[in-house]
């Protein structure tokens, strides 16, 4: 994985969540995770008003990001594993932290 490309894409993903750009958010999910998008979105505070990439760990074949999403109803931090997709990095696993 290219570190800078991955870092930029993960930040763009977090920004898309704040904008409510669900087409972009879903496109960042692996084909296996896309059907779970409604359940994943339901776990976020609504509306999401801020997303902060707290950490990003790079490895050769995947990267792990922790992103805190904040909204009117509170905040949640998610850990996501990213791998290279056909056109851009995609999320292959996501889970709440804590």
Question: What do the PLM-derived regions correspond to, one by one?
Answer:
Residues 1-4:
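TPR-adjacent "capping" and linker segments in tetratricopeptide-repeat scaffold/adaptor proteins
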Residues 7-8, 12-15, 19-61:
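Short solvent-exposed beta->alpha transition segments
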Residues 37-86, 91-98:
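Surface-exposed, charged secondary-structure patches
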